[in-house]
């Protein structure tokens, strides 16, 4: 039996969860469709998802149709959760993009379609809610052509009055997008020769598989209209990715979750081979894993199984397997699709309302960070504050709600701030010698600092022989440098540089690793002062769509938000800008655009990386260290 994995993507309230329920019901997987309003759906598993009627994390369910098993990964639909959308898309064989007939193509529809195109995911478009009063299907289809792609094929004729009737579109003109891109078919069409439906269907399937043609279907998920033709299209057009018939096992982890009982589970896409209970499989670059239990989606449920075949999604209990881990033969992974893996851009401090809940809060945040690579949790080594780093404000709102609803924790969250970084301006070095005041430590350390290109990260090299200074002392120096890099001259993490341990001296037996660990950050700070540092801030690349009448204002307003316009094009009644903008300015820029365009602008953004900060430096207060601050001040007086 063929197994395919599909995703359902849509703007908020377009009906993708309802569509999932309708697919399960029409295929016979369930006896009654669930309701978003009643909280009985099978894919919105989190209380917050059911409460708000939006999907936050990807869930998996399944149905069978025409000897094909279809696993549905119900991908998230909120803009702050695109990272999980991209991660889920990487395991898909195809996608259904849902558009509300009432609302048409929305800003988020364009963002999601942009991601599908970027990752070359075969996609079928489903125009939902055609039974609502006042819909204009011609206008919706035209907006699909203008704002998404002209390479669409309308698969049905739709009559809305006196009752809704959906019929297969047999008009040869409906196949224009197929015929125009095939020389043989185009010659026959121009010559007036007949073209067989089989040839058209083969060309359609090839184009869909290449993600260069997008069939459009209509219906109403809530009332079951147009669902069977959609299932026929999905099972007929989409083909499983990966090497077919491969014997060697290969699978990739795309999701981690915790059950209400605290059990950790991972979701694995099996690209080749067969996985059996009690197998021992290799984790790429790590230890082996014994399969003691596994589950798969089946007919609307998650069931235990002894065997999982190529193409399947497997759910394993595991405390050690991580996101993106590869089980089995890594060389059999299909050609890697593009996938965004942005860094968190914002951070804040979070605390429980009562001190007694601190450990519970840390445990909960550790679980949440384990399931979301864009959420990071750490405890400040000096102030002991809990620091959260994240991508967007709505993400923080959801974390707070989850802590309240799922973990029963009430928290106090400070206003988020942008995460800046620092980079040395030039090569510099500094040495502090043993027994030379004001050095109170039994250690001599010399460090050099060299700036690297943006995005390089931190490199470290020890040029002091292990034969002279043993490993415990060397490790202490590196630990001290790591601590020193946490606070540069402006108080932010230092990056994009190479640190070399050039010189070390110790006195036996009085010198200890602690002396080297304490002195290293002070030497590093002095080297950075000689170098100077450049403040860096996160930048986003953007694509802006706005009505043509706002071309001048959109262009001339960009510098107000430190945005740079790189290209400008006029397409029909729309202007398209590309450029870059500091992350701290994007929310205000979007708000202003939405205001003067009456909500008709769309701004797609992706993290570009860190660049030189614009404007006055943002200085972060230095975190106190009672052990080292007195020594630092002594050195500042003599330097």
From Swiss-Prot:
Pfam families reported in the protein's UniProt record: EFG_C (PF00679), EFG_III (PF14492), EFG_IV (PF03764), GTP_EFTU (PF00009)
Keyword Protein biosynthesis assigned: yes
Superkingdom as given in the UniProt entry: Bacteria
Matches recorded under InterPro entries: EFG_II, EFG_III/V, EFG_V-like, G_TR_CS, P-loop_NTPase, Ribosomal_Su5_D2-typ_SF, Ribsml_uS5_D2-typ_fold_subgr, Small_GTP-bd
Gene Ontology MF terms in the entry: GTP binding; GTPase activity
Biological process annotations from GO: response to antibiotic; ribosome disassembly; translation
Signal peptide (residue range): none
Keywords: Antibiotic resistance, GTP-binding, Nucleotide-binding, Protein biosynthesis
Coiled-coil residue windows: none
Entries under CDD domains matching the protein: Tet_C (cd03711), Tet_II (cd03690), Tet_III (cd16258), Tet_like_IV (cd01684), TetM_like (cd04168)
Residue ranges occupied by any tr-type G domain in the UniProt entry: 1-243
Reported function: Abolishes the inhibitory effect of tetracyclin on protein synthesis by a non-covalent modification of the ribosomes.
NCBIfam families: small_GTP, tet_protect, tet_protect_M_W
Entry's family note: Belongs to the TRAFAC class translation factor GTPase superfamily. Classic translation factor GTPase family. TetM/TetO subfamily.
Record's protein name: Tetracycline resistance protein TetW
Native source species: Butyrivibrio fibrisolvens
Lineage: Bacteria, Bacillati, Bacillota, Clostridia, Lachnospirales
